[in-house]
Design a protein with these regions (language model features):
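Active-site loop/helix belt of alpha/beta enzymes
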Residues: 2-6, 17-18, 50-55, 62, ...
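Short, conserved acidic/polar surface loops in the N-terminal third of protein domains
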Residues: 84-85, 103-107, 125-128, 149-153
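A charged N-terminal "starter" segment
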Residues: 1-113, 170
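Short hydrophobic/aromatic-enriched beta-strand-loop microsegments
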Residues: 89-98, 113-116, 135-139, 228-231
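Active-site beta->alpha loop and helix N-cap motifs at the rims of alpha/beta catalytic domains
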Residues: 108-123, 131
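Short, acidic/turn-prone active-site loops that include or flank metal/cofactor-
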Residues: 78, 96-100, 119-121, 232-235
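Generic structural signal for well-ordered alpha-helices
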Residues: 26, 30-37, 61, 80, ...
């Protein structure tokens, strides 16, 4: 089991030969988490991708988990696997693209929630879950205007309905990402809410809706919805200098 190195001499030996290293005060991480929680009043899904932004996936996740966090977001499947093994009661949203049967088997067998935006991916998860005699947990990514990955918002309701008809798929939620442009972000939120409303009008329950990451946590309270995804702000960093002293 992972144990932190706290002895300065041990740290010095471990970092021998390296010109620099990063140190994190976990009390500050707890402080930032508490402030975000008190601000938004909804559930949080911390972003711990890329080895928790270089701070250490397991120690950061452990600290947040001990504070009651249960949802985590990662970009790579191997990180989702590590979290599910280390913290079996946790829930992990994996953004990775899946290639090959072993990846689908791992997602289903570990109980990882997979980001889905193609019918082929949904069908393969369904077929894999059927072989495992279980259900695959999915979050559907909706493209509301960022134009990276996701189901286009105009076709999203039909897509979501088709995915939810697969017998071994369990919908955990819908999510999208902002452009971080004030005028366009309002339109993106409107599109996302329209998708969620139309899906629910069709009788499909949406357990979690998520739009807000770091910037929206500070500037768009109407986008907090059911769960927010704090990223850099958890680690004491904000992309916009004017927000450094925001309460």
């Amino acid at each position: 089991m992972w144990q932190p190195i706290t002895d300065p001499k041990q740290i010095q030996r471990a970092m021998a030969g390296y010109p620099c290293w990063l140190e994190m005060d976990l009390d500050n991480l707890r402080f930032n988490l508490a402030n975000i929680r008190s601000r938004v009043g909804v559930e949080v899904m911390p972003v711990v991708k890329n080895n928790a932004y270089g701070h250490g996936l397991v120690p950061v996740t452990r600290c947040l988990y001990d504070e009651g966090v249960r949802w985590f977001l990662v970009a790579k499947l191997y990180e989702a696997d590590v979290i599910r093994q280390q913290f079996p009661e946790s829930k992990v949203l994996c953004m990775d693209t899946l290639f090959g049967d072993p990846a689908y088997d791992l997602v289903v067998s570990r109980g990882i929630s997979q980001a889905v935006f193609t019918l082929d991916m949904a069908q393969r998860l369904n077929d894999t879950a059927q072989r495992h005699n279980t259900q695959a947990s999915v979050f559907i990514k909706v493209d509301t205007g960022l134009r990276r990955v996701g189901v286009h918002h105009e076709t999203a309701p039909d897509f979501i309905e088709a995915v939810c008809k697969l017998p071994h798929i369990r919908l955990e939620g819908l999510f999208s990402s902002f452009m971080q442009h004030p005028d366009e972000d309002q339109n993106m939120l409107l599109r996302f809410n329209e998708v969620a409303s139309e899906v629910e009008r069709r009788g499909i329950e949406v357990p979690l809706r998520s739009m807000a990451s770091t910037n929206a946590i500070f500037h768009q309270p109407e986008a907090w919805l059911d769960i927010v995804r704090p990223a850099m702000c958890l680690y004491g960093v904000h992309p916009f200098p004017n927000d450094r002293n925001v309460d």
